[in-house]
Amino acid sequence: MHPSVRRAAAATALGLAVLGSSPSLVWAAITAPASVVVDRYLAATGGAAALTSERTLYTRARVNGFGFDGRFESWSARPDRHYSRTTLGPFSLAEGSDGQSAWRTDPTTSKVVPLHDNDLLDARVSTWFELERWAEPDQGGGDVALEGSERDSLGDYKVLRVASPFTGVKPRRLWFDERTGLLMRVVAPRDAQSVITELSDWRLALGRMRAFTSLTRVAEMPMNRLTAVTDSIAINPSVEGLPFRPPTDAPADGMKWLKQAGVAQLPLEYRSRHLWLKVSLDGGPSEDFLFDTGASVTVLDSGFAARHGIATSGRMQAAGAGASGSATFASIGAIAIRGDDGDGVEFANLKVAVMNVAPSFSAYFWRNLAGVIGYDVISRFVCTIDYDAGTLTLHDPKTYHYAGREAPLPMVMNGTVPGLRGRLDGRYEGVFRLDVGSSSTVDLHTPFVREHRLGGKLRHALPVSGAGFGGKFESTMGRLKRMDIGPYGWNDPIVLLSSATEGAFASEEFAGNIGNRLLERFRLTLDYEHRQVFLEPSKRYRERDVLTRTGMMLGWYGDHVNALSVLPGSPAAKAGLREGELVSAVDGKPILEWDGRALERHLEDGPDGRSFTLTVERDGAPRVLRVRLKEML
């Protein structure tokens, strides 16, 4: 067995789901009970000398997962270098680490992505475990302790708690069979989830006992499983010339500028506090897509794909805001994002996820949703979002130069979503994801909420519901005293406190998501290549956060409109509106004759006390309700 098989499986499972360059070290230590377990493992697998004599190791395996078959190859070199490449159906993934830097390719575009922040730390830790540094005489600088005993249907185990020498990383749990002394299971925390690898088919090969089969799965996501079966091993092969460092001869990415090389300016519709683009697939008519920095991959709605005969393959579980949902995959020959003047960009052979997103989102947005433009497209550019002008400008990172007056803020990249450091109420600090797919000011993640007991600090708390890729989720909304990001700050921000136990809102790596209710205050520039964010205050900068003044949300279903949600104690609730009721007219005008944007302004704009009428169908007859606007928070 080579531990890199475990790493490739976990990386593929998480990469398709979707701290600095020199972390400080901790002192090496091993407890006496743990030493007994490690010594027995070494004896069972061929001895300590056999392990340390493997200066380099090559492993090749057949892999199966997500509905695809593929191949995996890995090279590792003591003490801290690693390179692997995986093909799985239409996807290819490569990754490497030279001990100080690390990189991987985007599995959908093959773009080489240098790793930073927690991603770099995770890569270095994974290499440390692959090389079984914890079994060396000095534990490779790590910390090893006996956690206890466990039992399942297959046997009894001694469980070690193994911490790498890098601070800020949760330890892994290694399960050793009490009968054989062999390592049978590895549980690796990954943010709010765990990646579990089961090892089996142990055989003697090249002087050591090795597990020839591994099954890796993501806890609570049963569809995300990958099996690797080793078919070739070599010890001490030459690793000369392997790309442990990021390769510079990256493959062409299949993108072209449609009008002017290096820059494209696109019309961007800002509606319902979301960003909308026109996108054409394979030369077809323009369709409505969301532009979403919180999406790890570009997504096509499954209903749209079925109606247009787009073939799909594979399967996986993907995490949304408060839950998880299923996805398949498709390859699109050409995707063009362009305006009426022909300006824009086009991508060839783009691999996309296919998910059932339209039913949830279309009702909220009063328009059909064909898909979502995500990280795999967005990260190729320096993106400038001008909320006031309604434009999205895409720049080539190689030629872009910022010409404004604001100082750059350092972008934090953990995974595929950019983040900034921020502070709430002058004391609660964390990294916040910049999510232009959110209409909120700030959505605070469950672990951050619990750590700082923010539920008791909210003013005017209200229960609210929202929607993400995985479906609906519940939160609590209210105001805190202040929010600061770099030199920018606001009083009385509206925040949502998540109680999600799965999905993105259960993340421990981020304090929360910053959404468009805050970002619309700026002209926003995201420079992924150089890890910089520019915030240029605009006309909304000093506006106070205002919640809906009706306390209701109307859902559009093509041929009818329902009351999607009604907040308790809101003006809509006081007028008698009930969730789920059919709404047929507003101020006497048939509801389906209203444009969604015009209706939004009509229902929310104006001073407190302004009123309008809703006609609802109740008990088989129309009933007119009068709603008076009033600020709720």
Protein language model regions, located:
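Pepsin/retropepsin-fold aspartyl endopeptidases
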Residues: 175-178, 200-633
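Short, surface-exposed coil-to-beta transition loops
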Residues: 68-72, 89-92, 167-172, 194-198, ...
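Beta-turn initiation residues at beta-strand->coil junctions
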Residues: 63, 86-89, 106-108, 162-165, ...
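N-terminal mature ectodomain segment of secretory-pathway/periplasmic proteins
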Residues: 29-30, 36-110, 145-148
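Flexible, processing/modification-adjacent segments and terminal tails
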Residues: 29-37, 43, 101-172, 178-182, ...
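Bacterial N-terminal signal peptides
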Residues: 11-24
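A short, surface-exposed beta-strand/turn
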Residues: 74-85, 95-98, 170-185, 229-242
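Short, hydrophobic/aromatic-rich segments at coil-to-beta transitions
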Residues: 52-60, 78-84, 153-161, 181-185, ...
